[in-house]
Amino acid sequence: MTFQQRALTGLLLAGVSFSSLAALTFQTYNPGEKGIFPVSSTLISGEKQAILIDAQFGTKDGQALVDMIKQSGKELTAIYISGGDPDFYFGLEPLVSAFPDVNVLASKAVVQHIEETKDRKLQYWGPILADSAPSKVFVPKVFNRSEFSLEGEKIYVKELNTHQSYLWVPSQKVVLGGVAVTAGMHVWTADSQTPEARSEWVQALDKMADLKPARVIPGHYLGDMPQGIEAVSFTKAYLGQFEKTLSKAKNSKQVVAEMVKAYPTLSGQQDLELSAQVNTGERQW
């Protein structure tokens, strides 16, 4: 472990000397229908300190996170980015400006993915985000550990260095599902382009359910926050239906038609259409 890694670890473990452990609280910001992606960012707070998990897609929503953190009255000790897709980190710019001394951290795999894809992602999404696009993309520092603490309470990174990584807070029996968990909308599968990748995704969901969480915060959701493990069960069932449909369909239009038939009330059909095009080989992503 390098000196820098030890310093970052010390920062995240700084609360372990607290003699009594206050229950952690979870405040989730999600732009819902107002966002291009309804992505979740969660402020995990102890008595005095807090850690932000994920940083939104655009700078306007990133500024909303700044306001939420300041209103909490807690000392922000770190920002942890759980996924390498731009809706997890493009909103960092106002956060880094407001909290310049706070480390932005991510696993080795997430940092590598961001470094490899950020330029072309900004080229594609910048015009769509318009005045909410970042003028500078911030890359997190590598923090390749599977656990850290907030005021003595352990937070575990499960499935570290995979596309399905998520956070587990055993003291509160809460899962932050990250990119692996969706609710109330079609599941984005454009980044999981093989049966093997989707099978690994399902296996991660099974392991998540085995933890018997009391609450799972989806990485993306529309509508009300689902209860218990509803979002895990939904995501797994959706992936199963998608796999079955994809194996029989001749083109993306057939995939879309069958998935809409199976899930007629879901939002996010544009996500389904793009995912179907990618997974049928009609479009590169």
Put a short name on every predicted segment.
Residues 36-38, 59-61, 84-89, 111-114, ...:
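Active-site environment of divalent metal-dependent phosphoester hydrolases
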Residues 210-215, 223-285:
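Accessory terminal helices/loops
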